[in-house]
């Protein structure tokens, strides 16, 4: 199922590549491009590197039609599928395979040195990615095979939590909360503070109010002759000065001041003889 989901991606395309038949290697010293007929390539065309899954494919195709000439599957790089020559950086030896499993070694070369560099780097990057994917898959398998930690609470297991400065003590009784009327608690005054009660505002109004003196009543009788004599007699003149009003804040001083402010009228003799 995983192989069906894999898609083919293109890693590198070079429009000009030459193919050479190479002689068998006589020793393990490596291949040399100088042993090839570099001026007479056996085939020229286009090179394309693709990848499907972890395998890279070097495909030699026709420049015009795109027909496949040869294909070299690469499972590891550097490896036996792709080798560099010992005397040049522009030539390589690849192992091509057909559908029946037969294989052969041929030489390829690039005219431009930059094309050879891109060919080499494309293969290196692909297999570097393959190595990283392999390590990640191994780590995930190791994590799955490890015994899982049981972080749940066992039956009857408890823990103790400390929140800020509040710590729970074993066997300690909680302090009762004082509740006011209606379930509302009053906050205590701040430490070191003094509560000052302002004087009532009504005291200023009472101290500034002056009670008027009462009107004195007449000492004469109610007969007609007395009324006539009172009309003829001159009005009495008071010589006493009223007492000063106290502006003290004492509430009872206003009442004593009002009583003392009443003038004392002395009876004066009348010039008419009363009958």
UniProtKB/Swiss-Prot annotation:
Effect recorded for residue 275 to A/F/Y: Loss of binding to AP-2
Record field: compositional bias (Polar residues): 256-275
Effect the entry attributes to changing residue 273 to A/D/E/I: No effect on binding to AP-2
Modified residues (Phosphothreonine): 211
InterPro entries: NECAP_PHear, PH-like_dom_sf
Annotated effect of mutating residue 272 to A/F/Y: Loss of binding to AP-2
GO BP annotations, alphabetical order: endocytosis; presynaptic endocytosis; protein transport
Alphabetical UniProt keywords: Cell membrane, Cytoplasmic vesicle, Endocytosis, Membrane, Phosphoprotein, Protein transport, Repeat, Transport
Intracellular or extracellular location(s): Cytoplasmic vesicle, Clathrin-coated vesicle membrane; Cell membrane
Motif WXXF motif 2: positions: 272-275
UniProt xrefs under SUPFAM superfamilies: PH domain-like
Residue stretches in coiled coil: none
Record's comment describing the protein's domains: The WXXF motifs mediate binding of accessory proteins to the ear-domain of AP-1, GGAs and AP-2 through hydrophobic interactions. Selective binding to the GAE domains of AP-1 or to the alpha-ear domain of AP-2 is tuned by the acidic context surrounding the motif and the properties of the second residue of the motif itself. The WXXF motif 1, which is preceded by an acidic residue and has a glycine in second position mediates specific interaction with AP-1. The WXXF motif 2, which is followed by the C-terminal carboxyl group negative charge, allows specific interaction with AP-2.
Function: Involved in endocytosis.
Family under the similarity heading: Belongs to the NECAP family.
Protein name as annotated: Adaptin ear-binding coat-associated protein 1
Organism: Mus musculus (Mouse)
């Amino acid at each position: 199922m995983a192989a069906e989901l894999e898609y083919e991606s293109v890693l590198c395309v070079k429009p000009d590549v030459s193919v050479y038949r190479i002689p068998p290697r006589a020793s393990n010293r490596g291949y040399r491009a100088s042993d090839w007929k570099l001026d007479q390539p056996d085939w020229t065309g286009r090179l394309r590197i693709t990848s499907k899954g972890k395998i890279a494919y070097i495909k030699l195709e026709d420049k015009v039609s795109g027909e496949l000439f040869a294909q070299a599957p690469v499972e590891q790089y550097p490896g036996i599928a792709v080798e560099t020559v010992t005397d040049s950086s522009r030539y390589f030896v690849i192992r091509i395979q057909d559908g029946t499993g037969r294989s052969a070694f041929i030489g390829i070369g690039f005219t431009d040195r930059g094309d050879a560099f891109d060919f080499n780097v494309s293969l290196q990057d692909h297999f570097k990615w393959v190595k990283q994917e392999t390590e990640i898959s191994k780590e995930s398998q190791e994590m799955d095979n490890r015994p899982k930690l049981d972080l749940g609470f066992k039956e009857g297991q408890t823990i103790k939590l400390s929140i800020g400065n509040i710590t729970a003590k074993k066997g300690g009784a909680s302090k009762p909360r004082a509740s006011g009327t209606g379930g509302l608690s009053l906050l205590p005054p701040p430490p070191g503070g003094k509560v000052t009660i302002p004087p009532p505002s009504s005291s200023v109004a009472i101290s500034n109010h002056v009670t008027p003196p009462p009107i004195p009543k007449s000492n004469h009788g109610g007969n007609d002759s007395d009324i006539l004599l009172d009309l003829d007699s001159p009005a009495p003149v008071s010589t006493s000065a009223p007492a000063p009003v106290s502006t003290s804040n004492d509430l009872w001083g206003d009442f004593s001041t009002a009583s003392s402010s009443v003038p004392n009228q002395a009876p004066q003799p009348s010039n008419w003889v009363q009958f």
